[in-house]
Regions:
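Internal catalytic domains of large membrane-associated glycosyltransferases
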Residues: 1-130
Length: 130
């Protein structure tokens, strides 16, 4: 089944990229992949680097790439703490999370977001059913 994002369904969403100690070069690739995801209204896609080491060079990378940055210097709760910190600062109805070494396909949003607007649909053993 292929479902396409309709204009009325292109709601705001936040893309959170969790990082702990990954190098800027790796993060550049991940952010670049996220920036190139297709979506009908790209102004509704907000990408953030969530850095639980609060590194100045990663904040600069985020700035240079035109995305948001959340630094967290006193994280005691690992990735969950990092993402919860970011979630406390965002308000989009949908959130996508990626690890620092995940590069999404350009069609990721176009193929996943429509499922959130299907009424009474459930995922049952890998199949969408009413």
């Amino acid at each position: 089944m292929v479902i396409i994002v309709k204009p009325a369904e292109n709601i705001r969403l936040d893309v959170l990229i969790a990082t702990h100690s990954e190098e800027a070069g790796l993060l550049f690739k991940t952010v670049n992949g996220c920036r190139h995801m297709a979506y009908p209204d790209k102004s509704k896609v907000h990408i953030y680097l969530c850095d639980d080491n609060d590194r100045p060079e990663i904040a600069k990378l985020a700035h240079d790439m035109g995305i948001g940055y959340f630094g967290l210097s006193d994280n005691k709760l690992a990735k969950a703490g990092n993402l919860n910190h970011a979630l406390s600062k965002t308000d989009s109805p949908l959130v996508v999370t990626f690890d620092a070494d995940m590069i999404p396909r350009s069609n990721f949003l176009m193929e996943t977001i429509p499922y959130f607007s299907l009424p009474e649909m459930i995922l049952d053993h890998g199949e969408w059913k009413k």
